[in-house]
Amino acid sequence: MYNEEHLHRVFNERRQEFRCWVITPLSNLITAFTKPWLFLVQPPENLEASGFPTTTDRFKIDMVSNVKRGGDEYSLVHIPATRIPNPLETCEAVRDTRIKTFAAYKVDVPRSWTNSEGDHIELDLMSEFQISCRESDLDKIFLEEHEHQLLTIEWDVNSATFEAELDALHFFTEEKRLQNRGPTLKSQRAFRMIQNFHSSWKDFYDLHKDFPQLSNPELRRHAVPDAILRRFKAFNNDHSNAFNGLKQIPNGLYFVNGCPGSGKTEWNMILAGLIQCSKRRHKKKRNPILFLVDINKAVDDAASRYYSLCQEAGVKIRIVRMHGWPLEMRQSAKLHGSRSTTNQDSFAVPDFTNRFLVTAGLSKQTSVSRDPGIVPTLDQASWEYFEKNKRDAFLGLQKLLDKMESGEALSTDDWKHLRSHVSRLYRVVLARTDFIATTPVAAYGRFSKFFKPDIIFMDEASHARELTTLIPLAYFTPKAWIFTGDVKQTQPFVKDAKDREKHSGLRFNPFAAQLRMSTMARADHVNAVNSKLLVNKRAFGNLHRLPSAMFYESQMRSGYDEASRYPDGVAYLTIYLQSLNGNRHVDENRIIVNMENSNEEKHRDSYWNPLHHQWVLAQATHLLQDDGFRGLRDREMGGTIMIATPYSTAVKQYHAAVKSWPESWQRRTQVLTVDKAQGNEADVVFLDMVRTTTAGFMDDPKRLNVAITRARQAEIILMRRTMAYVPGKKFGRSKYLSQLWDDTLLHKRIVTI
């Protein structure tokens, strides 16, 4: 924990500047003390390296420029801020399309300021920075470059994740004074089981019994939609074995480990669809499902993917994506209320008022509706439900909002009633929601009192720390917890000081190795994983072969027979690779380009390689202009490209170059660090290893596995021969990169330039 807090201190000391535009005051949230403003902030290209807040982070902002009023100069610093969902992200049409990609902040600016004479006076200082395009509808605004301001971020070094993880552990281990305050018996048995996977005491649960449609989805009486049934029938043997294993789940815990391209998330989605989309007899509500991923973007992707599946199936499922329940619970301050309330009291009564009023205010400032193809957040869903039912079910709340809109001040009792009405609204919305996608940290604590899922999926479970895994086990008692992931690709992130980093103030963490071992990895280590998915349906052109041999004991196999691995588009790229390879035969669509005159260049603590950079961009633009380069999934579309590299400086350089390309090319191109590439794929992948004197950190098996399993049709690796060796050791060879080099050399697929 020290290292994570230290990094936040480093970010604070660095005082990195971010471009922002001051849009409009949020009039319905003005109090006697603060006037909230909506900011739109341009995210940096490398979010991780820059320390850019998410909706669950705690921070303040400083404006770089000062404001002069009445002969005095004022500094707008240490101003509390919250990242909120961008109100224009989900709008179908906006005038300035850049806005949809920006982050939105609610910034609570003080109304009272001290002048040079020591007097407290009311000033609206932030209006000095407000953009000139002051449309009543936010979707009509346009951001002028010369009107941008600069801000810096001051992080709260305390971690909400750390608190949530330890609270979950204490929930299991501390003696409870009240019997109903602790975990259920089923949760306790699951907790004991993950301490010893082969313990003798096990209760077995049968999901096929709980959901009869699982036993035979094709029976007409279950009325499973064709779109879901068609996908179910396409299950391979591995998928079917995992599906049948749901008949005997030990203590409700089920682990499914899957290789790249094996359809892990798809398997989850089809199972969820079978449970929720079949015909329901004598049931008004569908069986609720909680879908957890510990990465916010993956949360959004999962919600969108399930929504698309249900849309295709013609079934109306109420789906919500949720970021940041802990902030809503602990940090949405009781507006105009007493601050003397104990932590226990504020914990017991979640206060949604602040978020709801933000959403309400912003909704009234946009004339276009939310894009129906984008899953709403919890706050958006609550506002939309209120709008549909305000005259019937929420008349009291409507009267209070009308009172606020008229400019009339609310009394203390009014604010209490407002919080009560909003809390009831959120309870109603959560009670009628069928599917919630969120992070484990957002699901911690009192959320379990509002939403009681029958099934919990934890996708990318091998990426979650063991303490994170405890959160769904501690607070929920579903029929089953289903964990899916790939222990060969990902592991939890734990910041630890390597030798080269000790000067930066980071400390050696003696528990780092233990913290990097996920619950799923431990289960795999003792052969306690229930099912394995080892059929790769992503890779064509024999791209599956090498990672299978290196990382999966040659058990990962292609989902296609030999005749089907080279459809026309893949065969076209084989010819392209052969042209790079001096017209030598290429037996699989992977080559290494060894640029002997290239050199790495260091920028701060990161690297890039200018010669690699130029060559990759030249080849990428060549392919993007080639009509023969087609998408594998849709031959009518041009193929896609991923440029992956281990180093943030190299990513920044590629991003800058790609931004100058035509918009149509940019839409077909991704630039990612290798660590961010997990879960992404492209038709052609350029993997720029950058380094020329050492293997760097690419000799890590999980990182390398991710790197060489992203391509669907072809993979081009820029790598120097020196990366196959360990510097300073005579004849010493890197463990994994040497295998990559030797295999490619053996098959005559190394191109030396």
Residues covered by each model-derived region:
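Conserved helicase motor core of SF1/SF2 NTP-dependent helicases
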Residues: 441-458, 462-753
